[in-house]
């Protein structure tokens, strides 16, 4: 079931498209088609699963930017991470694994201040 996309989600999609340099890059990160991101930006409904992915990506991204510069944060998302059992953070975003991601980011933050 689709529902109208709240303004906050549309705003997040727009901001993330800018942060990741294109709608195509955001679509790849979220594991959806580029046309779907375009529809969201035009106010089309978003399903709950993808809305959660957008929310999680925004949360992860904003926390990563407290630790890293944007290019390093992008690399962190795509790199294999030992704190995540040698999985890529981006795959956990797609799977909605918020707790594991935030735990890894907190560990990264603690290491950066140690």
Regions inferred by a protein language model and the residue ranges of each:
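Non-transmembrane "mature" sequence context
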Residues: 1-114
């Amino acid at each position: 079931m689709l529902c109208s996309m709240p303004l906050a989600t549309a705003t997040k999609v727009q901001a993330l498209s800018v942060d990741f340099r294109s709608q195509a890059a955001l679509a790849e990160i979220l594991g959806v088609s580029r046309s779907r991101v375009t529809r969201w930006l035009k106010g089309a409904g978003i399903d709950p699963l993808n809305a959660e992915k957008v929310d999680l990506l925004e949360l992860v991204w904003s926390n990563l930017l407290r630790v890293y510069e944007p290019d390093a944060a992008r690399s962190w998302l795509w790199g294999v991470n030992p704190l995540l059992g040698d999985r890529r953070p981006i795959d956990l975003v797609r799977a909605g694994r918020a707790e594991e991601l935030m735990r890894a980011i907190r560990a990264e933050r603690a290491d950066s201040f140690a």
